[in-house]
Amino acid sequence: AQDSCSHRCGELLGTCSCQATCQSLGICCPDYKEFCLQISPYSGSLMGGKDFLIENTAFNASSVITCRFKQKIKTRGYVAKDGKAHCISPLLYETGFIPFEVSADDGLMFPYSGTWLSVHHNKVSDAEKCTLVNETKWQYYGTPNTDGNLTLTWTQQTLATTHINIEVWGYQETGDSYSENWLAEWTYLYTLAREIPNTGKFSFIPVPAKGNYSTWDFGILRITPSNYSDGQRQIYFWAFFFSSNIPSIWSSEHALAWHLGKDFRNDPAAWATAKCIEWDRKEEKLPNFIEEIIDCPCTLAQARADTGRFHTDYGCDIEKGSVCTYHPGAVHCVRAVQASRQFGAGQQCCYDSAGTQILTRDSTGGSTPDRGHDWGSPPFMKPPRIPGFSHWLYDVVSFYYCCLWSDNCHVYMKRRPSSDCRTYRPPHAASAFGDPHFFTFDGLNFTFKGQGEYTLVESDLTSLRVQGRTQQARFPNGTQAQVTSLSAVAMQENSSDVIEVRYSQDLNLEVLLNQKVISFSEQSWMDLKGLFLHSTADQNITVMFSSGSGVEIRGSGGFLTLTVLLPEKFMNHTQGLFGVMNGHIEDEYTFKNKTTLSVHASPQELFEFGANWAVENGTSLFTYDTEFLLDNFFYGEKHNASFLPVFFPYEDPADPLVTEMVLVCDSDPFCRFDVLTTRSLQVGSSTRLAHQNHKLLVESLKPVISCGWLDHPTNGQKNGTKYLLGSTISFTCDQGYELTGSKERICQVTGAWSGDTPSC
């Protein structure tokens, strides 16, 4: 009998395949599309309640659909009039791709399978959430000068129903901090409005919540069709966890000022002060996470260049007009991508318009570290690693208590002081671009135009591997040129997911996750195994591995540009075309057997060096999902020894292209080289830009010396908030006091301040 994909998606069977690559290779089992599910939409908030369609499988109208996530969380599905099945996503305490299966016989067998992308609650589109109109009013309700109506709006088409309920849910974490019994829980509290028309708008005058509900100060609203019972989510059925999730629209999570009790409304500042002091006492007993988090980059330039370890904080983004509500005076903030190892804590770094780091000791606009990383951290599921909500509980609600609802911000800043940058070490960068020109970690550059698949960098420190494929470039008229360009890059670290970025044959940029092409149409950010993946609107792809290493890939006209960023700990732990990262260029051209070539080697000798780093089928990370790739790269040679490139292109003064080339390239040798070998000014122009970007990156990543923060003397002032090499801080005393010690101190090359501590 022919093999079947029932229960077998992702496997290669005896006679056919149930893997994603089977479609382009034409080797799928006949029932591949029936059992291996395509869904739309493919992502939704971790809060659940999102209806998604199973596109490729038809079911009987009488089928009883059950959807099961992670092999244990079950939700009810249904068959629509068109015969297509739908599932409802469950409440999950994690982000990332979640495997799910579908049963059509009320849960006896689950032969169908697919994956659902669970995302951070702030990363779903606005249309999927209901909007707290004038959100500040909701979060300050009951404080002086904030009263009257509150309004909620939503997209009414999202729920196919005439009447809705609006529920209030609260979030809490119970048990002992940092212990096995520390648990996260969303709880249905009460129904705010029942059976109201689904018009897309609701206004009300809030009253303090009844009973002990008003003790919940952090939560969320949920809109559901009114034909379900209140708060319906889970029914415990024997030993099975059967969750009857229902279609829902959630609001953004927020401080529940508007439903707090009379004690809050009568004297909000006193109530908040008591809460702030209580939080401070709790923090006193918790372990110090600040010693564990990475230091901030010293300058805005470093922060924006270190893309493997830091990513834009969407709450303060220079590319979106610097709307920095929580950080007055800042123009840009970044967050450390990885949570700290033991405590799952997060780092944040903010900068002013001069590019200088803003510290909380100087300004309330300073950056504050987080006991709970805002994005959560693997393995999720338990505090302090719950995406978004753990962070709200320890770092945001407490900010409301101390800074926004009362005047005790000094208490908050004492527990969340900015880290300075004295221990920050910038990463080292290597790049490849154009008709491949390579810039190594130690700053050597060379051109290697082999055709094949090569190890760009590998490291024994974290089993990091980045591999590049080069293909023959084409002239503008379509014929093949005697040069190559980078057409695909594949990478993995330890046992992480494998990411590949490549140009397809029709020159579309594709990103593959474990051999499957993925779409960024709904989500530009993905939390994956061992890495984060980000794509900008113009297809700049960034991979951030858990070690802090980063890979950036951009495409232009069939040529890939690649940058790899490695933190200092990779020193003396790299090999491949990008060289041995150790600060010396003499050993850049090191072969697999550890012999080296002179740095003055000829292009022909460098061709030998490059060929030595060809990958083997056993260690290749690439996906071979077309006849062309199989023939040329899988069954063919990994390094095409018969392909001989142009080593020295001829510059003919009578060639009209040369005149134009000078205008485009100026004196850039790589640009000139690529124009002559590809006959394309556009390729030359992209090469020049990539070369300039690399030089700029290396410049931005130069180490900066910091002498650390200086305090003002008691009964005196200080002038200046820059603490980097060459900065001067001057001191004066209040009237009636005299200064002893240094009037001004300068940050010296040793990392120490000149002079002595002043006092008044």
Q: In which residue ranges do the predicted regions lie?
A:
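Extracellular, cysteine-rich, disulfide-stabilized repeat modules with beta-strand cores
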Residues: 10-12, 16, 20-30, 286-290, ...
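Beta-strand/beta-sandwich contexts
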Residues: 36-60, 115-151
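Conserved N-terminal submotifs of small, disulfide-stabilized extracellular modules
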Residues: 702-760
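Immunoglobulin-like IPT/TIG beta-sandwich domains and homologous Ig-like subdomains
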Residues: 45-107, 162-209
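Short, disulfide-bonded extracellular cysteine-rich repeat modules
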Residues: 17, 23-36, 344-350, 413-423, ...
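Short edge beta-strand/loop segments characteristic of extracellular beta-sandwich folds
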Residues: 50-57, 88, 151-157, 730-734
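Short, solvent-exposed loop/edge segments of extracellular or virion-exposed proteins
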Residues: 45, 434, 439-440, 708-718
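Von Willebrand factor type D
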Residues: 125-703
